[in-house]
Regions:
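Conserved G1/Walker A P-loop phosphate-binding module
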Residues: 2-107, 220, 225-229
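Canonical P-loop GTPase G-domain recognition
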Residues: 20-33, 172-230
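Conserved protein kinase catalytic core
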Residues: 33, 65, 107-110, 146, ...
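Switch II of P-loop NTPase G domains
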Residues: 35-37, 76-81, 92-97, 103-133, ...
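Short, glycine/charged-enriched secondary-structure capping and boundary segments
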Residues: 39-40, 60, 112-115, 150-154, ...
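Hydrophobic aliphatic residues
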Residues: 60-64, 126, 189, 215
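Conserved nucleotide-binding/hydrolysis micro-motifs of P-loop NTPases
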Residues: 75, 87, 97, 104-106, ...
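Conserved C-terminal guanine-recognition region of P-loop GTPase G domains, centered on the G4
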Residues: 119-195
Length: 230
């Protein structure tokens, strides 16, 4: 009972600390679309199909279905830009920024042509977005990272971005399994000691506050165009 009460208190604190006044899907880009040149900074979320990106974004934004979720892998086939708290500067509110949902990769039944298009779309975004400040790589905490996860992590590093790994679906594991699973992710991605892994659950909202802290922290990082050599 005490654990439940502590969890409820943590959820209430996260909501108080990172209130959402406004959240809208502002831009949707396909493979041939021109990427927007946003003034507000961007943080991106990458991960394989069905890893829980849409659920995570909805949890961050305290919305049930702004980011469309589906049990069918490969649902997100575009780059989706969510504008958060436009011109908001008050304490206690989430910062004015964009959350960028990248297409899920590794969808087994997608054609080779479709997979290549998604790959080019993601790579182009990572390489060219001047507003991008941080990339969150989502990995299912229940499974070892896949070859696609490793390739995605390498893309992020090569683009000059700092990566943070989010271990999704933490509520699906027993507490005794958590440490072993996190070590499996760190080893599987060959992460350095400084690379952060955030356990996250869309069911309990655990990790919401930690992710928002890192999103806010990203606003003060070095200009992404300098990091990428532009």
């Amino acid at each position: 009972m005490e654990a439940v009460e502590r969890n409820n208190m943590a959820q209430e604190k996260a909501i108080v600390n990172n209130k959402i006044r406004e959240a809208v899907l502002e831009t949707v880009c396909g493979i041939t679309s021109r990427l927007p040149e946003n003034a507000a900074y961007e943080v991106a979320f990458a991960g394989k199909s069905n890893v829980g990106k849409s659920s995570l974004i909805n949890t961050l934004l305290m919305r049930k279905s702004l980011a469309r979720t589906s049990s069918q892998p490969g649902k997100t086939q575009t780059i989706n830009y969510y504008r958060i708290n436009k011109d908001e500067t008050r304490d206690g509110f989430a910062p004015d920024c964009y959350l960028v949902d990248l297409p899920g990769y590794g969808f087994a039944t997608a054609s080779v042509e479709v997979k290549e298009k998604w790959g080019r779309m993601i790579e182009r975004y990572l390489r060219t977005s001047k507003a991008l400040k941080r990339v969150f790589l989502l990995v299912d905490i229940r499974h070892a990272p896949s070859a696609n996860d490793r390739m995605m992590y390498e893309w992020i590093v090569q683009s000059g971005m700092e990566s943070v790994v989010i271990a999704t679906k933490k509520d699906k594991l027993k507490p005794s399994q958590i440490d072993k699973s996190l070590k499996q992710i760190r080893t599987g991605l060959n992460l350095g000691a400084d690379t952060r892994i955030i356990p996250f659950s869309s069911e309990t909202r655990e990790g919401r506050d930690a992710v928002w802290d890192l999103i806010r922290e990203a606003s003060g990082s070095s200009d992404s165009s300098d990091m990428k050599g532009h």
